[in-house]
Amino acid sequence: MNFYKVFIFVALILAISLGQSEAGWLKKIGKKIERIGQHTRDATIQGLGIAQQAANVAATARG
């Protein structure tokens, strides 16, 4: 059980140290994911606005 904790700790330290030196490609992937998220957010906001307008038109048409 102790070996398992030590192994996880060493693996975590290695991952952090290697991750900092190899951050270039990881940062690019993160930026792409962030951009996709922004586009999704903007499309959702736009879709909600259109749906609200359609609901207003439907309510006006009903009287």
Swiss-Prot record:
It holds the Pfam family Cecropin. The keyword Secreted applies. It comes from the Eukaryota. InterPro entries: Cecropin (IPR000875), Cecropin_insect (IPR020400). The keyword Plastid does not apply. GO terms for biological process: antibacterial humoral response; defense response to Gram-negative bacterium; defense response to Gram-positive bacterium; innate immune response. GO terms for cellular component: extracellular space. Keywords: Amidation, Antibiotic, Antimicrobial, Immunity, Innate immunity, Secreted, Signal. It is found in: Secreted. Residues 1-23 form the signal peptide. The modification Arginine amide is found at residue 62. Cecropins have lytic and antibacterial activity against several Gram-positive and Gram-negative bacteria. Belongs to the cecropin family. This is Cecropin-1/3. It comes from Drosophila virilis (Fruit fly). The gene is Cec1.
